[in-house]
Structure formats: C-alpha cells, structure tokens
Amino acid sequence: MPFEAVIGLEVHVQLNTKTKIFCSCSTSFGETPNSNTCPVCLGLPGALPVLNKEVVKKAIQLGTAIEAHINQYSIFARKNYFYPDLPKAYQISQFEVPIVSDGKLEIDTKEGAKIVRIERAHMEEDAGKNIHEGSYSLVDLNRACTPLLEIVSKPDMKNSEEAIAYLKKLHAIVRFIGISDANMQEGNFRCDANVSIRPKGDEKLYTRVEIKNLNSFRFIAKAIEYEIERQSVAWENGRYNEEVVQETRLFDTAKGITLSMRNKEESADYRYFKDPDLYPVFIDEKLLKEAQKINELPGAKKIRYMKDFNLKEDDANLLVSDPLLAEYFESMLNLGVKAKTSVTWLCVELLGRLKAEVTLENCGISAHALGALAKRIDEGKISGKSAKDVLDRLLEEQGGDVDTLIEQMGLSQVNDTEAIVKVIEEVLKNNADKVLEYKSGKDKLFGFFVGQAMKNLKGANPSVVNAILKEKLD
C-alpha cells in the first residue's frame, strides 16, 4: 500500500539580543556554567520578570518576513511542567494569543513551488541545559530565560526533502533579517518534527509522533525518513496501533534510529494560564512600523542577482544561503569586480579551499582582499593561475595585502604592449624556420610561439600575447 507522510515542524529560534527576555543577564554563549544568572532566571521567590522590548521588535520582524498577521495585543502564559533545567517549574510562553499568526513560506520542491503555512510564532523563554556525565547530571542555567521564537508550521510537508527546504529557507530568513545567529551547533536553531503517515489519497490525520531537539539538517532528514519507514512497516505488518502511539521520541545519531522518550503531552497537561506577573503586550503603530522595516529577504535578493547580474539559479541560491556570502559578493561588486569573476573566486576558489573547521567568517580573508585579487584578474594584472597561488598564500597567512603579495611573489603580468611586441618579434626572429612551417599549415606551432614569448616575458597577459602573435603571424 502506498503511503504519504504528514509533517509539521516546530522551530525554536534563539534571538540575538544582548540580554535575556525577562532580565538583564547576558545571553553570551560558552560562559562559565551558571555565571549568567540572577534571581529572575533562577526562579527565586519574589523575583519579577520585565519584558525585553527588543524581543518584541524581532518577533515583529519575523512576522513581516513570513507575511504573517502581527497581533498588536498578545499575552504571556505559564506552561507548567517539572524538569531539572526549569527552575520555576513553569516556562513563560504564549498560548492563546501569540504575537504572530497565519504566516507562510514558499519553498522550492521537485514538483515546483509550494506554500507551507505557518500557524503561529510566539515569544518564550528557553530552559537551562542538563549535562549528563556518567552516573550523575549537572544543570547549567546560563541558557534559562534566553529569548526564543517558536515557529509552528501547519502539517503541509510530505517528505524529508520538503521539510529541509522549509527549514533552510527559514534558517536563511532569520539570519538575513538579523534576528538570530541561527548557529545550529550552539542550539540557536532547533527543530521538533511531528511525523505521521496515511494511505495516499486519505485525508484523515493519524497518530503523530514528535521527534525532539534536532539540530542539524542532515539528522533532521534522517530522523524523518526513519520515522516514516518505521510507521509504514508497522502499518503493513498489522501492528500500527500497538507500535505507533502519540509520544515524544529522540533520534539516536549513532544508530540512525528514533527511540521512545516519553508519552506526548497534550496542551491540557501543561495547565496553561495567563502569567499574572506580566502585562499584556500592546504594540502601538509607531513600534509596528519601525520594526517592520526589515533587510532584503533572500528570495528577493536571489531574483535581483539573477536579473541584474545574469547569475545562474544555482549560483544565486548559494549566495543567498548565507548573509556573509551575499555580503562578500556585494562588496566585491562595489570594488568594481565583474559579477561572474566574483562568483568564481568567492563560491568556487575560496569556498573550495575552506576545510571543515574553517569558515568564511574565520578564514582571515576579508571581502576587500578577495575583491582586490579578483579585480587584478579583471584588469589583466595577474593571471587566474597565479591568482590561485596568491589566494593560497592569503589563506596560509590569514590575510595580507594583495598587491604586496603579487609583487613579492613576482606574479605581475606584463601589459605593456610595446614590451610584449619587442619580445614576440625577437622570438619570431630566432625561430624563422618554425615561422615558415607555421605559415605552410602547421597551426599547432602557434602554442610553441606563445610558450616562448611567455617564458621570455616572465609573466604577461596571455590574451594580449595571443592577439599580438596572431597579428604578426597572419
């Protein structure tokens, strides 16, 4: 029996505010455990939360980017549950009236463009972090009270490819509009996947399973694919009702399987109620208009790149996958580098040289340095082959001045036409017999003349050498 998957995603985006959502503690990552804490984020009696206005602004920006409705009145609620990393025994979140609702994202699929509806996005605080070591566990509350936006999609995705396309689009958006670093390794962008299956053509929604805390696109895809397979096999073996229950599962990255964690709670289990310590959020027109001024979105940027610079779709997609890539590209254009040259030296030459532990951000080569190198190629002052040697040196030395390196490495091309003509005439004079052979039909000798000229010139613009040689020989 053919099945189709029904997939909905809950994405937790950690906002890049300097301080936490309800207190003035720092949100910096990697600090000494429990050093960025105060009575509010420790949940001590009598401590009262105060909402960080920047969190509201960033929520509005996200809502604008996903074409959603911004609720100018929203409320905070307490989500009650007990866990060691939740010192208050409740999480401050939004339930009945979220700040953002009814959004959408358009994704590219094999069948063409598809709209994924977004039910809501709400503000909430993050929990702390449990660290399990051997037979005991530690709790680090530095992350407690860090601001999150939880973005909840409708169950509109049918396979792992669509889910990853949606996540990558959302991941790019939150970085381009500047509301989150979205560093998945640091937990800034985490995903819970709700997965169920049904016979193709059936509109009924069957038992869904939630897979928690997935923080890499590769593992998200693998977890979804495994869960679809597990549920399909259970159905075909007549054990669907026994083996597929509403529960929360974890993905074992080493074994590539999902494992049962606990029964999935319903909203009633959390006993949501309005938080009495926080006023409702009222957004006036001034704040709304101010926050709705967002950076150019990756989709619009992609269209502009293809239209204005005649880029291929694959190249444009790569450039808008990362704000820093787009920034480098535009900086190179501003230096006068041709679009095609910029793409080649940024996306092929530089990215192709970066190793797993080295990123564009920490490679040491600035957009200005890469642009200067690419511009020297456009100007004919250095050959593409020589430029690769300069790029290798820049990476090795974590930066440097391009023109100084070209000079030190003796890679400048001769562009002086008179000097090139003089050398070519000398080459032809010294090889008069081969000139006669060439003129009698041995066209392959042209490469010999080019090689001799380039050797004597010790670096010259090949296109200029070729043009002058052709003129002299023909």
Swiss-Prot record:
Gene3D superfamilies: 1.10.10.410, GatB domain, N-terminal subdomain
EC class name: ligase
Classification via PROSITE patterns: GATB (PS01234)
UniProt KW keywords: ATP-binding, Ligase, Nucleotide-binding, Protein biosynthesis
A Pfam family it matches: GatB_N
Reactions performed catalytically: L-glutamyl-tRNA(Gln) + L-glutamine + ATP + H2O = L-glutaminyl-tRNA(Gln) + L-glutamate + ADP + phosphate + H(+); L-aspartyl-tRNA(Asn) + L-glutamine + ATP + H2O = L-asparaginyl-tRNA(Asn) + L-glutamate + ADP + phosphate + 2 H(+)
SUPFAM superfamilies: GatB/YqeY motif, Glutamine synthetase/guanido kinase
Record-level Gene Ontology MF annotations: asparaginyl-tRNA synthase (glutamine-hydrolyzing) activity; ATP binding; glutaminyl-tRNA synthase (glutamine-hydrolyzing) activity
A Gene Ontology biological process term: glutaminyl-tRNAGln biosynthesis via transamidation
EC nos: 6.3.5.-
Subunit-structure text: Heterotrimer of A, B and C subunits.
Family, similarity comment: Belongs to the GatB/GatE family. GatB subfamily.
HAMAP family: GatB
Protein's job: Allows the formation of correctly charged Asn-tRNA(Asn) or Gln-tRNA(Gln) through the transamidation of misacylated Asp-tRNA(Asn) or Glu-tRNA(Gln) in organisms which lack either or both of asparaginyl-tRNA or glutaminyl-tRNA synthetases. The reaction takes place in the presence of glutamine and ATP through an activated phospho-Asp-tRNA(Asn) or phospho-Glu-tRNA(Gln).
Protein name (Swiss-Prot/TrEMBL): Aspartyl/glutamyl-tRNA(Asn/Gln) amidotransferase subunit B
Provenance organism: Helicobacter pylori (strain J99 / ATCC 700824)
Organism lineage: Bacteria, Pseudomonadati, Campylobacterota, Epsilonproteobacteria, Campylobacterales
